[in-house]
Amino acid sequence: SKLPARVKKIGKEEAIAEYAKRYNVPQSWCEEAFDEEKQKADSIYHYHMDIHMEEIHQLRPNARFVMFDACFNGSFHLDDYLAGAYIFNPGKTIATLACSVNSIQDKWPDEFIGLMATGMRIGQFARLTCFLENHLIGDPTFRFTPNVNAGFDINQALVLKEGDVAFWKKQLDSPLVDMQALALRKLSDADYKDIVPLLKESYYHADSFMVRLEALRLMVLNHPAQSAGLIQDALNDSYELIRRYAGEYAEKNGSPSLIPAWVESYLQRSQEKRLRFKIMGGIDAFPYADVKAEIEKQTASMTLYNREHVDALLAQLPRQEKSMERDIETITNPKSKASHVRRDIRTFRNHPVGGKPLDMLLAFVKDESRPVDQSIIATEALGWYNLYHDKARIITSLKETKANDEALKKEVQKSIARLEGKNR
C-alpha cells in the first residue's frame, strides 16, 4: 500500500526505483506491488494479522479480566470497540482495562499487577495504575481467588491502612516483591520522612527489578533535585526496562551531571534500539556544546570498530541546535505569526528543555507586552517541568510573576500547583 501511495506523489517509475534502492531489492519485486491478485492476497493476509471486533462478537470469551495495551481498544464513546466486545458478550469476561484513545508510551501499565495473586480487586489495581485515557470497563470489585498469602486482606489494607507508616514499613520485608514495591509507594504517599534514603537504599540493594524500578520511579517523580545520581546508574541497570525508563527520566530531569552517563549509554548501548530511541528523544535536554565535548572526551580513549553511530550523533547535534534556535527566534520575535508562537511553545510540554529554552519561557511569561493568550500557553508549558532537577527556580519565578489578567493569574496558580504537587 505504501508503494502505490508513493506513486501518486512522484510517479510509478520513480517510486519503483526509489523503493528498490531503499530496500536493496530487484525492481521486479517492486513491480509486483501493482499486481491486483497480489494486492488482494496481501489485503487478506494483513486483515488476518489483527483481531477484529466482529470476530469477538462471534465468540464467548472465557478470560475473566482482559488488559489491553494498544490504542483505541477502550474507545467507549464509539458504537463498537474491542473492550466492549469482550464485556457485552455472552462470555465470562467480567472486567477490562483499556485506553480510549492512545496508549501512552512512558507509563508503567502493569505496575502492581502481580498483587492480583493476593486477591487484590481489579478496581484497586486500576486506582494504583490509572493514567490519562485508561479506563476500567466492567466490575471493579472482581478479584481472583488468592494463590499467594499476603498475611492480611490486601483490599482492606489499601483502604484502612492508608497513611499507616508503621504498617507499610513492615511490608518492606514481605517475601512478595510486588508487596515491597507497594510499600514504597504507600510510604511515599504518606510523606514518610526518610523516604529519599529509603528509595536509594531500595534501588541499590534490592534483588528484584520490580522494587528497583519502583524506587527509581518514585525518586524521579517526587524528588528530582536528588535523583540525578540514581538516573545515572539506572542507565546501566541490568534490566532493560529500567534502562529505558532511565533514558526517559534523563531527558525530563535535565541535570548537566547526567551528560557523561547519557553519552556513555549512547556509545556503549546503541545496539539496543528501544533504549537508543529513548536516548535520542532527549537529545535537546543538555547544552549541545557540552554533549559534543563529552562525546569527544569519551571516544578519545575508546577502540571503535565502527564510528557510524558516533558520527551520526555528532552530525545530529548542530541540526538540533539550529532547530532549537529557530524555535526560540519564532517565539521571541513579536512579528511571528501567533499560531506559530503557540505551536512552538507547546513543544516544550512533551520535551521540557532546560537552559536557553527555559530561560526564554520564564522571561516570556513576565513580558507584559506579549498577548495574554500566548503568556497563558507559556505558563502552562512551565507546568510540565514537574520532573526537572531545578524546578524550584521555576516555582520561584512563577510566584514572582505579577499577572493582572484573571485567566493568566489562574494559569500561574495551576502551574505552581503542578510543580509543587505529588506525583504517583
Question: Predicted segment positions?
Answer:
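Amphipathic alpha-helical repeat scaffolds
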Residues: 169-173, 181-185, 200-201, 213-217, ...
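C-terminal, active-site-flanking charged/polar segments
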Residues: 84-93, 110-135, 146, 226, ...
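Short inter-helical turns and helix N-cap capping residues of alpha-solenoid HEAT/ARM repeat scaffolds
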Residues: 175-176, 207-208, 238-239, 270-272, ...
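Amphipathic alpha-helical scaffolding segments comprising HEAT/armadillo-like alpha-solenoid repeats
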Residues: 161-171, 192-203, 224-235, 255-267, ...
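Active-site proximal loops enriched in glycine and acidic residues that flank catalytic Cys/His/Asp
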Residues: 69-72, 98-101, 129, 140, ...
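Structural detector for internal amphipathic alpha-helices that build alpha-solenoid repeat scaffolds
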Residues: 155-158, 178-190, 210-222, 243-255, ...
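Caspase-like cysteine protease fold
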Residues: 109-193, 210-214
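Catalytic cores of nucleophile-dependent amide-cleaving enzymes
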Residues: 2-108
